[in-house]
Amino acid sequence: LADLAAADLVLWLPADDGRFIAAAHCRPATSTTVHVDDIIGLHLPAAREIDLRRALHSGEVVRSPAARWAGTYSMMETCVPVCHEGRIIAVVTREANLSSPRLSLGFEGWTVAAADTLCQMMARGEYPYDSTPQVTSHGVPRVLDGALLLDAEGRVQHATPNAVSCLRRLGIRTHVTGKVLAQEITEVIGDGTLIEESMAVVVMGRASWRVEIAARASTVSMRALPLVNGRKRLGAVILTRDVSEVHRHEQELMTKD
């Protein structure tokens, strides 16, 4: 979420003394961090508590009306209530450094819109997901590794250059924008390839699972981030990562053993 939003995420818990204390912090890999120093365990300045209390009591996402000057940079802050089992238990601040240019990764702003949707889902208790993929030795795909945006029907709306490169490794040479990702992948896999049962669910963006797809001596790991509003499917973000070299290294070690 931090990478999609190109912003720091700070989890604030209401303390017994009525103030907020920082319990967790995640820096973005797609922009410059707002907090250079470690802030875990620190209290929120009283001047910033108004928006957090609004989010905590209203259960709605609260955006600052204007940028705030923070020393040597300006910052735009969004307060996102964290809903769990129908109760607001914390607030996440999404803090974007406006003085630093975002990394040019071919995103064209759609990742920020996807982050907005995930924040709305967090306020409704729909994100983080109930089930998340386990971290393997290959790691979990990140936004920097490659990202695609699918609509509710599984059609590709946007793709970062790294995601396009991952698809090319699998043998998908044509432009995928406007096409159903699942169909494009099925065509290049081949009949003799073992297909994981979860593949269709992931590449259609219907569950927050992870799957590895192998074709043409290449292996690409994919993870789905479904975008929903209640029972309505809005689409999904698919994160991709080329793990071919890792697989080849593992095969070499097995051969030596």
Regions inferred by a protein language model and the residue ranges of each:
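Sensory coupling linkers of modular signal transduction proteins
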Residues: 92-130, 226-257
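Short, positively charged
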Residues: 55-62, 120-132, 188-192, 203-206, ...
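Conserved beta-strand and immediately adjacent loop positions that scaffold enzyme active sites
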Residues: 8, 78-79, 146
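Amphipathic alpha-helical coiled-coil segments that mediate homodimerization
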Residues: 1-5, 51, 114, 131-135
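Non-catalytic regulatory/interaction regions at protein termini and inter-domain linkers
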Residues: 2-61, 66-73, 83-87
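Short clusters of small/polar residues that mark proteolytic maturation junctions
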Residues: 24-27, 93, 161, 224, ...
